Design a protein with these regions (language model features):
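A beta-strand edge to alpha-helix "cap/lid" segment located at domain peripheries
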Residues: 2-5, 10-107
Length: 107
């Protein structure tokens, strides 16, 4: 999970959860989600990228079992690479535009 920032505070807000603060707690929350037997496939769609160096923002849809979330991901440049320091996802009735695909790489 090298996407997470190492030299600053991080936070994640999973849908329906309390905010989780601190790198180790955030990483553990993702491990629990992704390693659970019922772990769903998460498909990112329609990413919109805003760069205000040294901070980058990606707003996208996340599709899980035909349902959609809207997610905001905040990144900071560390050692020349973009590292996430905040992720927030929540249910939405909106839908991504047709034909959108996730980016191949952020770095």
């Amino acid at each position: 999970m090298n996407v997470w920032a190492e030299r600053m505070e991080v936070c994640v807000v999973h849908p329906g959860w309390e905010p989780i603060y601190g790198r180790e707690a955030v990483l553990e929350s993702w491990r629990r989600i992704l390693k659970a037997p019922e772990s769903p496939e998460i498909r990112g769609q329609s990413p919109q990228v805003l760069v205000n160096d040294p901070v980058g923002t990606v707003v996208c849809f996340e599709e899980i079992k035909g349902n959609f979330l809207i997610a905001t991901n905040l990144f900071v440049k560390q050692s020349g690479r973009w590292r996430m320091f905040h992720h927030h996802a929540a249910p939405t009735d909106a839908r991504p535009s047709e034909g959108s695909a996730p980016p191949a790489s952020i770095n």
